[in-house]
Amino acid sequence: MYEGKHIHFSEVDNKPLCSYSPKLCKQRRLNGYAFCIRHVLEDKTAPFKQCEYVAKYNSQRCTNPIPKSEDRRYCNSHLQVLGFIPKKERKKKTDPVDEVKARHQMDAMAFSLTVPTLALKMPNGLDSMSLSPPGARVPLHYLDTELEDPFAFNEEDDDLKKGVTVRKKLQSKLAQNRQRQRETEILKVRQEHFSTPPTPPQQHTHLSPLSTSLKPPAPPQGSVCKSPQPQNTSLPMQGVAPTTHSIAQIRQASHKRPLPLLPSSRAPISDAPRTDRILMKAAAFSPHLSCISRLQRLVKLCTQKRQLDADLFPHLGLDWSEESGEELEDADQASPYQVAWSIRETLRHERHTSDDDDMESRSSRVTQLCTYFQQKYKHLCRLERAESRQKKCRHTFRKALLQAASKEPECTGQLIQELRRAACSRASLRQTKLKEVEPAACSGTVKGEQCTKQALPFTRHCFQHILLNRSQQLFSSCTAKFADGQQCSVPVFDITHQTPLCEEHAKKMDNFLRGDNSRKVQHQQQRKPRKKTKPPALTKKHKKKRRRGPRRPQKPIPPAVPQGNLSMPTSVSLPVEASQMRSPSTPELSADELPDDIANEITDIPHDLELNQEDFADVLPRLPDDLQDFDFFEGKNGDLLPTTEEAEELERALQAVTSLECLSTIGVLSQSDGVPVQGLSDRGMGVFSTGTDASGIQSLSREVNTDLGELLNGRIVHDSFSSLELDENLLHSAPLSSPPTALAGQIQGQFSAPASAGLTSATLLSQSALGERAFPGQFHGLHDGSHASQRPHPAQLLSKADDLITSRQQYSSDHSHSSPHGSHYDSEHVPSPYSDHITSPHTSYSGDNMAATFSAEMPIMAQHLLPTQLEVPLGGVVNPRTHWGNLPVNLGDPSAFSNLLGADGHLLSTSLSTPPTTSNSETTQPAFATVTPSSSSVLPGLPQTSFSGMGPSAELMASTSPKQQLPQFSAAFGHQLSSHSGIPKDLQPSHSSIAPPTGFTATGATATSTNNASPPFPSPN
């Protein structure tokens, strides 16, 4: 079984519901299918087909299913729309009591129908029937039970099978309605009119219960104040008193006796033996009140009947539709039988005529004719009964009026006057609704005098003064104004426009609009011949411009650079201006090649023309449709503000510039400080100072920081940087191969005991952009033999090296936790470089060994050197648990820092791409690789002193890569350094460095904060 997409079950009995795919349907499924009857067409295997009706308004086909077994093309709804079957009638509410009576008490009426002999011989299923006598009666309940016409034609014809079901329903409904209506009309009236109880022959004794027994019951629908049968007024008024006691009995028996329905010619004969019904004389009703009460009761019944026939709620605005109105008119003229069958026969006749079906059998036509005559006969019988009821009602009312007038004329006269007064009031109400109100004079005043004009209907003002009536909502004042600004006050009756205009201003507006259109047409006509006179080349060049509409004189475009007064002076030569504004699409045209008519036209353009609304009328419709999606003031992403990536990039660049400016003030701040311990501690550059000649160390720090500030502030121009790679002559082999032992001895003499410190590779690598270029003349004589007097302070070199190490390591240690790998900037966690907050990180050194190593009065080392960067092993042995990226360096050997300065006074930088130096010992390379794996760069300036206990014969600067990559500081500030120091953009170094060790990222070098700095080494207690 095929199922749709929506598989769901009922919440009541958990049975599967319709699985219609497009939307959720909660109808029950058909047996054997997964869809309801409305959506069963989704299952292609179902024995249903789709209705072929196509709607005119949307050209969509009807989706109602039709069983394939039925030979029809349309569903039931569209069969009614197309007129093939009659439309459904409106159901009328009936009294349930009447339904019970109509169901159990069948009508005695029967109709006689003589069947033609020709119809009996035709093959219509009636061959076995015999001729019915003229008086044969077919009971009406036959239609209620069988619901089929006994004289119906054969249903073998396919075209006639379509309306079988509808015809059966129609016949059953019509028969039931007619039966109910006839029963209620006949039975109720017989019970209410002049039915006296059986009494003795005395006249005065049988009238007292009459007044009590004749209480008017609630009139049901269809009850009329009519007598049971017509009275023969031509018969004499015989006062047969002994027969009055049998009146009630006869009438009660008449309820059970069938009433023969005969043609109108036989009706008087049927009423002949019932002459005793009119034996009630006025003398028989001596109490006067009984006559008046009977008359009042009859009047009340007639009024109720009239109210039942009238509209129930006319004041609510409820009215019949056009279709229902037509149906009511047809029902007044003919019975539902005649209406239904006449429409059916007409449709059949039209269909047969259009199809030109000559093969229709004679039997079907005869059967059809018999059916029509049957319905026609029933209709005539119904009309005859209705007419007889009307006559009985009028006769009864006249008799009651005569009796009341003879016995109690005064009361009868009052009753008649009341009836006339009520009738006159109803008629006057109708007349007041229809007739017009008499015109009255206007109540307005003109210059203090009463207006003599006639007032408008239903008002007290004329048309001129109608605006004085504040309650009216039909008229409004003209919304136009005169030339002097005065508002027009003419009343206007205009309910279609939001801005009503009087007749005068409406004409002016029409003329203006008509003139505007004529001007447009004239303008277009003037433009057409000018197009034809254009040269072919020029027309071809400016083909796209001509599509934009008529040429309007406009002001010349002002020059790009303001010339003081932004308004265009009139003395400017317009032809020259036009030649300057010529489009680059026509570079071959010069001012001399322009046609004369164009030059003359340009010179004739006035300079004070303003753009009007009509100037854009022809231009805006010619603009392309896709121009509305283009915004001249938006970016390519469609927003006015920069994107998130652009904003973050801009913020990082500004923070980087701020960091550079902070670094550039190092030299100035260091010169103002006189204490060597606090000289550069706030900037993250500590100084190893001893008790010997602190002023020399301070002067060296000032010189270095001054040149560093000049480098960062761009005072050193890019002309002095010929390449980002250091020349080989800057790396002399003498200091690299033979470190001075004198400096080592002095350093060992300065410190009381040898100390081994673990400098991380990131710390040694941090000697980056601070010394990115050689500083000319600052350290020129430090390694020169002729200036040996300037070299007795190796602590200065150590201080300078640690200054650089500490400042760069501070960037690494402070921001390695806040910046993700792979990003150059961190816009969220950039602390202030002026922060002096100091935390206490974990320490891994021994206090006893430090007490033996440094004296109590030794100045504080770099505050920003973390304890993980300085490892002091016990007993001079290197800590076997080396941290990632830590490189143990012996602080007692100054040769580890002596070669940071070249032979000719240049500070060597490990941040630039330097060529690999030759190693004296190949055995030291694996050891270095194990200590600093994945380091960002190698250290070309370090000597072959003891690294992790290795001998001084090894040179650890060898590298397997041909070029050393930029470290983190240079990678982060490459753009800012190039913009400040003038490094060309094409010479900026690459950022594709080797992955740094854990804890140090490229972003960590971008910040300049001193947060999380390590405390200084404690003094021994």
UniProtKB/Swiss-Prot annotation:
Residues 911-926, 995-1014 have a biased composition (Low complexity). Belongs to the INO80D family. Its main location: nucleus. Signal peptide: none annotated. Putative regulatory component of the chromatin remodeling INO80 complex which is involved in transcriptional regulation, DNA replication and probably DNA repair. Keywords: DNA damage, DNA recombination, DNA repair, Isopeptide bond, Nucleus, Phosphoprotein, Transcription, Transcription regulation, Ubl conjugation. This is INO80 complex subunit D. Residues 194-239, 514-570, 808-844, 911-940, 976-1021 are annotated as: Disordered. It comes from Mus musculus (Mouse). The keyword Nucleus applies. InterPro entries: Potential_DNA-bd (IPR025927). There is a cross-link at K87 (Glycyl lysine isopeptide (Lys-Gly) (interchain with G-Cter in SUMO2)). Component of the chromatin remodeling INO80 complex; specifically part of a complex module associated with the N-terminus of INO80. The keyword Transcription regulation applies. It is found in: Nucleus. The modification Phosphoserine is found at S132. Pfam families: zf-C3Hc3H. GO terms for cellular component: Ino80 complex. One of its GO terms (biological process) is regulation of DNA replication. Residues 520-554 have a biased composition (Basic residues). Residues 224-239, 931-940 have a biased composition (Polar residues).
